[in-house]
Amino acid sequence: MSFTIETTQGLERRVQITVPADTVEGAVREELKRVAKTARVDGFRKGKVPPHIIEKRFGASVRHDVLGDVLQSHFFNVVMEQKVNLAGRPAFAVEQFEAGKDLVFTATFEVYPEVALQGLDQIKVEKPVVEISEADIDKMIDVLRKQQATWAETAEAASAEDRVVIDFVGSVDGEVFEGGKAEDFTLFMGQGRMIPGFEEGIVGHKAGEQFDIDVTFPEEYHAENLKGKAAKFAITLKKVEVMVLPELTDEFVAKFGPNTKTVDDLRNEIRKNMQRELKNALTAKVKGQVIDGLLAQNAIDVPASAVEQEIEVLRGQAAQRFGGNKEQAAQLPRELFEEQAKRRVQVGLLLAEVIASHELKVDEARAKTMIEEIASAYEQPAEVVEYYSKNKELMNNIRNVVLEEQAVDAVLAKAQVTEKAASFDDVMNPQA
């Protein structure tokens, strides 16, 4: 076998391979012998069919099968010999395939880029430093109390935190529009479910009152015929209810699990949950900055085939989220996923190089700790730990996450890291 490799463009390569005729014909003869042992031909016993009849009957299909095997085996021999970092599948083109002549074919393929990390010391990372305060815990307890709240009817005027029951009729230019009318409609005030100005127009009114509200539909409103239109809503306020929060007692906290018997137990449990959530959020925030820095300092080309594979993964995930199937996923435009797919391939290559260049191995103790932290969120943590330990796929996922975290740590060790005090809300609700 002889071959030549050339670069066509970017990460694309083409190899031309010549396989001696004797090699091909020998493979054909061996396959014909194998076929002859089991071939059934009228007039002959199994295994006793003459070679020339086997050749005539099965020769074409055998040569086709042998061709596929020879293309694959000789191409991958070149890949192994030349230590090619192959990306995706090759495209074969046969240039010569005739009996008694050398087989000549080409394979066009892509390779992964050679990555030489640079600029790690130029990456800037801002690391939030957060202390969970008693006030933070109080806020979480308020959320729990609101989830268990009841509602009591009141004769007082409606406020922005109340629940109201209304009839309304909406009109534009004096005409009632489709979907603009409802009776006994329950509205939780302050949640922004209605168009701007609607809830504000109810505040200050009491049950039994009838009044009008003048509003303007937003330009981005979903109904084309209402975008930007001035509207009038005739309101009948039938009921106003105020939220009644349960008292913070041992009886109340007992609803939240067998380990919460007192208010102090609940506060401790909430603190542990908040610490776990905070740790995950801080890890994600720092990792995001590290990855952004790696990409900014290391511009690399990526194989189109790898991007296409990632697009298909993202398509499938999108379809699953919305209850679709493979056929529906295939209809989603690739443009929706192309940038994200390219970024994911780039990040994967850069982190792989960090792992290789720093000779990182999975920290098994760290993996064990991660599983225990996941399990601590369940009522039977020991069972969760055992379930993970017996599930090879889950364990591999955990090890991959840990190795990726170790890679991020390796970059952080060289990056410019500054610490900045932040609140729990700053980290958990950055858009708030």
From Swiss-Prot:
One annotated GO molecular function: peptidyl-prolyl cis-trans isomerase activity
Alphabetized PROSITE patterns for the sequence: FKBP_PPIASE (PS50059)
Catalysis performed (reactions): [protein]-peptidylproline (omega=180) = [protein]-peptidylproline (omega=0)
Protein location: Cytoplasm
Keyword Lipoprotein: no
One Pfam family in the UniProt entry: Trigger_C
Coiled-coil ranges from the UniProt annotation: none
Biological-process GO terms, alphabetical: 'de novo' cotranslational protein folding; cell division; chaperone-mediated protein folding; protein transport; protein unfolding
GO CC field: cytoplasm
Family: Belongs to the FKBP-type PPIase family. Tig subfamily.
Purpose of the protein: Involved in protein export. Acts as a chaperone by maintaining the newly synthesized protein in an open conformation. Functions as a peptidyl-prolyl cis-trans isomerase.
Domain notes: Consists of 3 domains; the N-terminus binds the ribosome, the middle domain has PPIase activity, while the C-terminus has intrinsic chaperone activity on its own.
Protein name per Swiss-Prot or TrEMBL: Trigger factor
Origin species: Pasteurella multocida (strain Pm70)
